[in-house]
A protein has these predicted regions:
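Adenylate-forming
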Residues: 34-39, 60-62, 81-83
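General beta-strand structural signal in soluble alpha/beta enzymes
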Residues: 24-28
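Structural signature of FAD isoalloxazine-binding scaffolds in flavoprotein oxidoreductases
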Residues: 9, 75-79
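Active-site glycine-centered loops adjacent to acidic/histidine catalytic or metal-binding residues
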Residues: 29, 55, 213
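ATP-binding/phosphotransfer module of carbohydrate and carboxylate kinases, centering on a glycine-rich
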Residues: 13-22, 36-46, 68, 86-224
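Short glycine-aspartate micro-motif
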Residues: 49-53, 59-61, 91-93
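Catalytic-core segment of enzymes that process non-peptidic bonds
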Residues: 59, 63-70
Length: 224
């Protein structure tokens, strides 16, 4: 469950401040990814952004009106647990059913691919097969990007972002991932929401979270 995390964050923050005698902030890694990209990456100059990381799960960060959406207890932005298949979905590790990350994470793609061919053991192998024109893999990718796009379309109708950022190891796949997601999201939302909407790959890769953590710390200190 997510709920003990706020207590854990406070405990870590207090312990580190006591040990080092310095101010400490604790933030969600996907939130930090989004902030890093806004500060010096692919989302510079944007005020309304949905950042999504695809990997073992789905992480996310939402910037609205130039401010990170954290919620009342700092738990906002858990996009992976947006329930896209609430009525008939598979079990999620959080205890609910039908969470988006069970369908949109890279691990969901790998699970589906492994049922077809054990050699497709990770994203790299799957995309290599897709680039070689394997029709089975291309069909799997089409179904997977459908799941990603449908979740994003719902969020677009709620937050009306100007930019959707896709992060994670697979985000380098422009033609096989980013472009299909962009087309499907725009086709799935009301026309006014699609106008001006961009979908881009994150630029900072593994550094995004660290860069965003610095930015989060600076913002927190400025508020205080």
């Amino acid at each position: 469950t997510l709920f003990p995390y706020t207590t854990l964050f406070r405990s870590i923050k207090s312990a580190l401040e006591e040990d080092f005698g310095l101010p400490v902030t604790v933030a969600n890694d996907a939130n930090c990814m989004t902030l890093g990209e806004v500060w010096v990456g692919a989302a510079q100059g944007c005020t309304d952004v949905i950042g999504v990381t695809l990997g073992t799960g789905v992480g996310g960060g939402i910037l609205t009106g130039g401010r990170l959406l954290e919620g009342a207890r700092g738990l906002g932005g858990e996009l992976g647990h947006y329930r896209t298949h609430a009525l008939d979905g598979v079990d999620c590790t959080c205890g609910a059913k039908g969470c988006w990350e069970r369908y949109a994470a890279t691990t969901a793609l790998v699970r589906a691919a492994q049922e077809k061919d054990p050699a497709w053991k990770d994203g790299r192998a799957i995309f290599a097969a897709a680039e070689a024109g394997n029709e089975t893999v291309l069909a799997l990718l089409d179904a997977w990007t459908d799941e990603i796009a449908q979740g994003l379309a719902g969020m677009v109708h709620i937050f009306n972002p100007q930019l959707i950022l896709i992060g994670g190891g697979v985000s380098a796949q422009q033609k096989l991932l980013i472009e299909p997601i962009a087309a499907k999201v725009k086709a799935s939302v009301m026309p006014a929401f699609a106008e001006g909407l961009e979908v881009r790959a994150a630029q900072l890769h593994n550094d995004a979270g660290m860069v965003g953590a610095v930015y989060y710390f600076r913002q927190t200190m400025e508020k205080e």
